[in-house]
From Swiss-Prot:
SUPFAM superfamilies, per database record: Clavaminate synthase-like
Keyword Cell division set for record: no
Identification of the protein by name: PKHD-type hydroxylase azo0608
Organism the protein comes from: Azoarcus sp. (strain BH72)
Domain Fe2OG dioxygenase: 78-178
Cofactor remark from the record: Binds 1 Fe(2+) ion per subunit.
Pfam family for this entry, one: PKHD_C
Names of the cofactor(s): Fe(2+); L-ascorbate
Amino acid sequence: MLITIDDVLSPEELAQARKLIAASRWVSGHVTAGPQALHSKNNEQLPEDAEHLPALRRLILGALNRNPLFFAAALPLRVLTPFFNRYAGDSNHYGYHTDNAMRLAPEGGYVRADVSATVFLSDPEEYEGGVLTIADTFGTHGVKLKAGSAVVYPSSSIHQVTPVTAGARVACFMFMQSMVRDAHQRRLLFDMDMALLQLRQSVGEDNDAVVRLTGTYHNLLRLWADA
């Protein structure tokens, strides 16, 4: 399941994020590459000691935490701290790869990566190329969203960022463990959640069918959730 979400960041949040990033330095993106990705990853990343990284992470996580569509799609249980990358100049692409299944958490231990997300911080007009191409059972899709918008997709998907041939592509990316590890089950729950939302708007919260279907949604979540 691939879901795009417009305007995750408010205009004020986007402006603040871009201001902080403009004042930051970049290092090689190899610092977070796994064994396979190491050979295909050629970008830049904010280092862990970057002055503005904590503020940027709080900004992104705060925006995602208040977004109901993000919650419905990802059903996040544990969200790892976000990273920030840039594609420009000679560091301009990331070939096809799959994200590592297990990610080291800052506090220690490992988190299973079920869901990946990218929040775009550059507008499409600011760079050429740089398409996030995601291939999975739902087909192959190219994603290039306006700044402040996000895409959410299974971490098991094979994906790439095509070469940026002009300008600079800046984005935030992150991994999370979902309450529901199976992508097909998450898709069913998401579809049911969206259908229930439409049904409530049509017939109201107190409708008997709405009450019963809402109960079915939560019972399926109870059945499938790891938490």
